Amino acid sequence: MPQARYDFDARKPYRSNIPRPAQLLGYEAGDTHSTYREQEKTLLAIAAAAKDRVRVFEIGVSVEGRPLRLFAVSSPENLAKLDALRASNLKLSDPRTQSRAEADKTAKSAPAFVWINHCIHGDESASFESAMWLLYTLAASDTPEIKSTLANSVVLINPVFNPDGHERFTVYNNSLALGIAEGDTLELRQPWGVSGRYNHFRFDMNRDKISQSQPETQAESAAFLAWKPQVFVDQHGQVENYFFPPNSDPVNREADGKHIEDWTSVFGKANAAAFDRYGWQYVTRERFDLYYPGYLDSWTTLSGAIGMTYETDEGGRLAKKRSDGSLITLRDGIAHHFEAALATIIAAAKNRERLLSDYVQYRRSALTNAETDPMKRVVILPGTDPERLGALALRLQRSGIEVSVTASAFTSEKAHPYLTHGGKPAVQKQSFPAGSLVIELAQPQGRLAKTLLEPTTPLSDAFLKAQFAKRLSNLKKNDAEQTDDYDFYDITAWSLPFAFDLAAFWTEDTTPPKTQSLVAPIKPTLLPENALPPAYLISYDRENAAILALRLLEKGYRVGSMTKPGKAGGITLERGSFVVRSERNPESLHKVLRQLATELGVPLIPLSSAYTDEASVGLGSEFLKSLKRPRIAVVADDMVSLTGYGSVWHFLERELGVKFTPIRLRSLRGETLSTFNVVIFPEGFGYSGALGKPGVDALREWVAGGGALIGLASGGTWFTEKDANLTAATLVGADKEPKPEDKDKPKTPEEREKEREKKPTSLPGALFRARLNREHFLGFGYGQEELVFPLMGDIFLKPTTKGTNAVTFAKSNLLVSGFAWEGNTERLLAETAAVIDEPTGAGHVLLYLSDPTFRNLWRGLNRLLINGILFGPSRTYGDE
């Protein structure tokens, strides 16, 4: 028999002065998709009518300017002293501020803080709708259960994490005929530019917690740290059957497996009981892990909360037929999220005292673990790029991690370098200069700090054993058999010192160095006196030097760059450094240059003379090359990964501050191409087929005329395809045409295994040791040849024979961080290419095996891409 229609008004009696969402909206839950403004109107009206139970906090704005709010709901008694309760909870979160006895006393009387996060993915619409019914029920219901729950908890409701994505989705869907449950309906196929899952910049907001790159993430993180809840639920959709924890493996070691298993079982059983009352189906311990700290559930768990992902089984459309023919609706998906949220809140309130006590213990364990763990702290050398060091510090601070800086030099007796050369990591005596960053792991956020900073976060032996067993089984299967998927849900490496390309050590010394708190961005600058010199030198010892050059070019000023080292007026001109000559620029140069240099923290060195005593290369040399203003096109629309496009968009607009033109693939033809001198292909698929021979030929001709063709990840590896032939590089393990006599010959399991071992097994995402050619323009600005390079997937590149392999993987000891397949990955990856430049006529084909802009995560690779954009259109073969 079909189930009865779910009743959202089952928790009677309700306070009559609180308006129902349906009364404010003009329709019932699930009848249509609500817009942001409709939700905003509804929530604020409920809050205004229930001021004794609800307070509203403005926590930020989205990229497109939509307000982000947090609604705090509790009993009238608690709400009257909410500020004091929050202060007490923050004190509870820092075991250094009170004794165990004081913490135990607080835990006996304090409410539990429970955060319910809605609509992080904008097209997972059941979560967005359920927020209104959750707030209404908590604000209006007068049942003993709800009143008792509010007396023992403070509920924090974030009604929409990603309003910009949700608005795109809603406006598109509401403009169509909706509600058809059959088949592959139009509403399921959002146009490329809509895809409401992502925010304005098409970032996946549930992968942004490490980078903290988007304003929505930053606002939510700051609010979380201002409240420090004990429970955090992140609502998602849509899966076949509703999911709530316990999680599958792997679980991040710093999450404390037993602690998280105990509490996710408590909440899982509470959710199960609520669902069982209605006969609803659900799953646990499948697919959704708790390993990658970029997820909301992992990040909040590592911060001390019980962080959980809930996945509902409908939303995104009004109705669908399941595989067995039964019907499920948006209203059902809303109801499932609504009931799970209430069950979790009620369970937290009932278990309030133990929950608070265990929360304190988890936070305290970060301090006590550091006493016995050899890894006491992480020290990061200042290097030559203070802005990059400051950006890393800010990233940590946005995660609530305490960061300090050394005021004077100090020495560690037991320091472990992050990068070593063969064998086990060395333990050495190491001196550190003033200005080094220090992150003590003995701090309340120490567990999160450790997983973000440690060289690699281990996976359990049991999990690894299961993956290797699957691989062995897959190798032996015949071509008709289905292979097993591996259980990696996301990347396995993210260590921030590697990601930022900063030299780092972890130390064992029990006595910490003397430091001072870091409260301001690290951005010193050096400006010359008011005199107007004949030229300015901008040393390329920091990333922002290249950004300064780009912005000057963007504004129409003339900038040169040294292709070989030289001297002028007694000052060394390093390879790649920038020279801005006054007499070749308008008078406004001096003011604009000083403003930009101050903003970006870039020293300006005045050059009073072009004369050189010691070298043949000076300001008048042919090796000082004028740079062309990059006129950038980024391929967009179908075939292009939205997140790949979005990360490039964000990088160009927000990181570099330069303009670009999105261009459709089919528009890449002669007249349109001639407008640009840089074309970037983000990650995507099917490019050569979509372009066809005329399109590829037009692209090749454009490159030969001086264009820089940049391909990122799969947006570049298609250059190797037979139909493209834009590079001489080929793929490792590429299939060869079998001999005619072998075509129909059956293979033994051993032969199949041997053949498959010649191909890379797909990587979930790890970091590998690589070598950089610093004499090539792509290597300008780097202070060392050794580089850490990320890689995922099963595409490895053989070196090109017709250009420069600007970055190549090391010969041995390749794996630096994360997971690789023993006996396969390093054997096939050794000495292959990571970044290739193939001069073609007057232009360049630049192929990056991985995307430096991925999730705004690999900050240390930025210069590789900046150099391609900045120097690619200005370098002809032989300049290097």
Task: Give the predicted meaning of each segment.
Residues 100-104, 183-195, 220, 231-235, ...:
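Structured alpha-helical segments in the cores of large, soluble enzyme domains
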Residues 159-163, 173, 235-241, 715-716:
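Short, solvent-exposed turn/loop segments enriched in Gly/Ser/Thr/Pro and often Arg
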Residues 167-183:
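Aromatic- and acidic-residue-enriched segments that line the glycan-binding/catalytic groove
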Residues 185-203, 739, 744:
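Aromatic- and acidic-residue-enriched carbohydrate-binding clefts of CAZyme catalytic domains
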